[in-house]
Amino acid sequence: MAQFSDIDKLAVSTLRLLSVDQVESAQSGHPGAPLGLAPVAHVIFKQLRCNPNNEHWINRDRFVLSNGHSCALLYSMLHLLGYDYSIEDLRQFRQVNSRTPGHPEFHSAGVEITSGPLGQGISNAVGMAIAQANFAATYNEDGFPISDSYTFAIVGDGCLQEGVSSETSSLAGHLQLGNLITFYDSNSISIDGKTSYSFDEDVLKRYEAYGWEVMEVDKGDDDMESISSALEKAKLSKDKPTIIKVTTTIGFGSLQQGTAGVHGSALKADDVKQLKKRWGFDPNKSFVVPQEVYDYYKKTVVEPGQKLNEEWDRMFEEYKTKFPEKGKELQRRLNGELPEGWEKHLPKFTPDDDALATRKTSQQVLTNMVQVLPELIGGSADLTPSNLTRWEGAVDFQPPITQLGNYAGRYIRYGVREHGMGAIMNGISAFGANYKPYGGTFLNFVSYAAGAVRLAALSGNPVIWVATHDSIGLGEDGPTHQPIETLAHLRAIPNMHVWRPADGNETSAAYYSAIKSGRTPSVVALSRQNLPQLEHSSFEKALKGGYVIHDVENPDIILVSTGSEVSISIDAAKKLYDTKKIKARVVSLPDFYTFDRQSEEYRFSVLPDGVPIMSFEVLATSSWGKYAHQSFGLDEFGRSGKGPEIYKLFDFTADGVASRAEKTINYYKGKQLLSPMGRAF
């Protein structure tokens, strides 16, 4: 067991006071949790395998602060370890464009993933543990432990009240993730006051039922020996994740300790001074770090971590010699590169090919891609036969003892846990090694995972949502399952690809974009109903996010659509010309995000000035204002019935589109029209 002495106590006091000083400097933040949690953080990081000079070393231990509001503690710890934080960075805590934002963000040194909304961090940690287990099972060889790292997380009462943590903790227990160790900061205080007002369950019994190893430390404010002993015991558990309940005092040492008042406000000046006196620091000085604390962390954490990194590098060089194929593949993944020519395996389609639901063309794409992309790891939230996310011959990611699969398997059975699936995918992506996670559910149920979807965009995790049954076209399941507002919501999220392909070629383009994406997640919305392979659909043009799929000279109107409505718009355009000699251009706009990043010249060549533009999409119209003068869509809930009959009910037919196109032309006749894309700034 690790030994602790006065230098450890000094290090903990330094952590506490640096955290308090940050909050004091900003006059904003959360001093309570750092004061109580500092001993836990010290114990974790004292044994953490990391290298601040190579923070992305693949075999490092991961640490996730799920209760991200206590990030002043994390920044203090990372500064002491020599990560790229100066004292001035700590002084700039919570200031605009600082490197120390109010909750941990991935762009800050040493921060594995953006956390803050409670419950997300522990769920991301489950994803990291899954990735590590898969990575180890794929690449480890006898005598060559390429991956044997742990994932550590700190969570609070609030994290464990959030539903997403229940989803992911349940799955982690089922998957027997012995590489996951979580510390539960039980301080009995919430923003409202005592947690007993709303939360009195036996958390450890719940986690025991999930299949976790459970432990308890009663005196977390200062009993580093017991914390360390529990951690070492947790490492012995190879077939269960571990949760260690540590009873702490929020705001330990403060005049307000043990109260809700110390949670989220700066301490008063006299309180800060008495804290510093209590722990032997000058009460009139701030951001003080004794040199012996820097030296201690360098000796106990930094130098051993550098040595382990160097030993790993030497081992990897030998590995590449002994296992050249695996070594080459692994080096490529560590470089963040894709296999040369991988895109040639994307299926191409012609108008002579059978009409297929885009969920089926998606299945063809995924089946081809998993053969050439070992970093592609997928699953579904208990909708595999509907999402068509599993390929023939797939091996499930399961504990080998269950005989249901193994840890080298790349198909994850998430169960009915959409939010958990999203947060886990974020963690898999954040693990590194170029992992490309995808997860399937109905488009409408992506809303269950809104928190994780938003954090994927904020944290820059390029995960892929395979979102089938993308409209009223799903039919009989009715309005509870039919998405209306969902795409508008997703399109409103910054840094988010939202693809709705019209046929097979556009589906291939959507996946090409999603797989190539560096720091932008993707939602691929796919139809349940069959759609024709369109005559002028283009993989290359679709990669621009929008293009002219049916053109005429001097159009009287432009119809712009996505997905299943593109073919209807083309039929409407032909009908308009055959019956009224009205000339209609049709534009397919499968991804707004990509289209918006094309040159102004290209965008205005597709949707120019001087022509009325009408959008047609059988979902909410609210996201179409910047592309169309008029929108035809569905701003009410759908109906239960056969898909084609529901389309007819709302007049979503070629005749219905043609009629509204004619009305749009007449309305704007004689008026000077600028493209809706035109903007002053």
UniProtKB/Swiss-Prot annotation:
Keyword check for Metal-binding: yes
Protein name: Transketolase 2
Species classification: Eukaryota, Fungi, Dikarya, Ascomycota, Saccharomycotina
Entry-linked Pfam families: Transket_pyr, Transketolase_C_1, Transketolase_N
Cofactor note: Binds 1 Mg(2+) ion per subunit. Can also utilize other divalent metal cations, such as Ca(2+), Mn(2+) and Co(2+). Binds 1 thiamine pyrophosphate per subunit.
Gene3D superfamilies according to UniProt: 3.40.50.920, 3.40.50.970
The enzyme's E.C. designation: 2.2.1.1
SMART domains assigned to the protein according to its UniProt record, in alphabetical order: Transket_pyr
Binding site for substrate: H30, H263, R359, S386, H469, D477, R528
Source organism (scientific name): Saccharomyces cerevisiae (strain ATCC 204508 / S288c)
Binding residues annotated for thiamine diphosphate, in chain numbering: H69, G116, P117, L118, G158, N187, H263, E418, F445
InterPro entries documented for this protein: THDP-binding (IPR029061), Transketo_C/PFOR_II (IPR009014), Transketolase-like_C_2 (IPR055152), Transketolase-like_Pyr-bd (IPR005475), Transketolase_bac-like (IPR005478), Transketolase_BS (IPR020826), Transketolase_CS (IPR049557), Transketolase_fam (IPR033247)
A GO BP annotation: pentose-phosphate shunt
Active site: E418 (proton donor)
Family: Belongs to the transketolase family.
Top-rank lineage group of the source organism: Eukaryota
Catalytically driven reaction(s): D-sedoheptulose 7-phosphate + D-glyceraldehyde 3-phosphate = aldehydo-D-ribose 5-phosphate + D-xylulose 5-phosphate
Keywords from the named record: Calcium, Magnesium, Metal-binding, Thiamine pyrophosphate, Transferase
GO molecular function: metal ion binding; transketolase activity
Gene Ontology cellular component annotations, sorted alphabetically: cytoplasm; cytosol; nucleus
Note: Present with 149 molecules/cell in log phase SD medium.
Record site: Important for catalytic activity: H30, H263
Subunit structure: Homodimer.
Positions annotated to bind Mg(2+): D157, N187, I189
Cofactors: Mg(2+); Ca(2+); Mn(2+); Co(2+)
NCBIfam families associated with the record: tktlase_bact
Function noted in UniProt: Catalyzes the transfer of a two-carbon ketol group from a ketose donor to an aldose acceptor, via a covalent intermediate with the cofactor thiamine pyrophosphate.
Keyword check for Calcium: yes
